[in-house]
Amino acid sequence: MRLSRFFLPILKENPKEAEIVSHRLMLRAGMLRQEAAGIYAWLPLGHRVLKKIEQIVREEQNRAGAIELLMPTLQLADLWRESGRYDAYGPEMLRIADRHKRELLYGPTNEEMITEIFRAYVKSYKSLPLNLYHIQWKFRDEQRPRFGVMRGREFLMKDAYSFDVDEAAARKSYNRMFVAYLRTFARMGLKAIPMRAETGPIGGDLSHEFIVLAETGESGVYCDRDVLNLPVPGEDVDYDGDLTPIIQQWTSVYAATEDVHDAARYESEVPEANRLNTRGIEVGQIFYFGTKYSDSMKANVAGPDGADAPIHGGSYGVGVSRLVGAIIEACHDENGIKWPEEVAPFRVAILNLKQGDAQTDAACEQLYRELAAKGVDVLYDDTDQRAGAKFATADLIGIPWQVLVGPKGLADGKVELKRRSDGSRETIALAEAVARLAP
């Protein structure tokens, strides 16, 4: 992509309404535009990051055996009355009536609808286990939306729902999602810690929140520092095998949100030097809720003995749009964003330091075409801005690799390669640049 043809409305000043770093940088970098309180238009740069995150989530869900579908944003109110949650959910739910006076709602979550789909088609235990997921926009009418995408009213979410014949099988499904989440967040360059949490209106007796440590987080957290060094399962993890050792390794180390924090246990189990009391950002949460929805909505299957029994369920959410903000909170400096490579809007930025110079233009053009031909996401700054402005833009928007091309270096057949994550620079031969930057 040539920057001269890209829509990148960068702001020079910090927006007054932005209270935290991620919100400020997303607005300054031209990733978002606020259209109403807690509702944003995703501009091209932000949309590219959003799609990268969405794809990682999708790949890891598929790897764990979940199957993708797509449910609508609008749901029938009667489904929620059937489960008993319509009145209990409160003013966060946006209730709507169509022209025929049918009561609808803009879905804040999808337990009811997925249960309705399941019960319409699945009648026997032989079709289980089953895990269905979708990635869809949701709406919760937050009383005080703030912090940009961290606490917006409209948000993109991945929610998965597992269906099993009994509790033992359901807990295996829970463990699969637990491991899938560890891998998902690690691929994004995040250290997300699973912490015991309350189940809230979703229900059930088992839940973990996945928390990214950040002082701007809304959740108070207490954990043993050892959890920061635990290994994340590799790509070869066997989801059909016994995942218990992985789960035990991660859950045996103390880590809890403030809602379920046990101060006495914390002080007795965790050496004082290892205690970490801080704040964090919730980027995902998983639940085992047993027969909560199948009981009320009559979602039964015939078991091995031929008798009908309610299915055991779980739900598993990832805040896809929230993750954009969480990654920025964890990966930034005074100059802007430092995207991990897997989620960066572009992997490489080519900075033409003397636009209009024939040799420099030709070298940049050749490098741009060769990288693009190799499948590299590359942004070529071919604008007539001064070099300092180009450096500032590349740092602000966080491109992991910057190739600085100017007449002085080209006289020796050289370009400068800068790594955004640590600011390191090295001079390399122009002829080597493609091999260095193409994965």
UniProtKB/Swiss-Prot annotation:
Q: What family is reported?
A: Belongs to the class-II aminoacyl-tRNA synthetase family. ProS type 2 subfamily.
Q: Which GO terms describe its cellular component?
A: cytosol
HAMAP family assigned to the protein according to its UniProt record, in alphabetical order: Pro_tRNA_synth_type2
Gene Ontology BP annotations: prolyl-tRNA aminoacylation
Enzyme class at the top of the EC tree: ligase
Cite the InterPro entries for this sequence.
aa-tRNA-synt_IIb (IPR002314), aa-tRNA-synth_II (IPR006195), aa-tRNA-synth_II/BPL/LPL (IPR045864), Anticodon-bd (IPR004154), Anticodon-bd_dom_sf (IPR036621), Pro-tRNA-ligase_IIa (IPR002316), Pro-tRNA-synth_IIa_bac-type (IPR004500), Pro-tRNA_synthetase (IPR050062)
State which gene encodes it: proS
Q: What is the name of the protein in this document?
A: Proline--tRNA ligase
What is the E.C. number?
A: 6.1.1.15
UniProt-annotated location(s): Cytoplasm
KW Phosphoprotein (keyword) present = no
Q: Does the keyword Protein biosynthesis apply?
A: yes
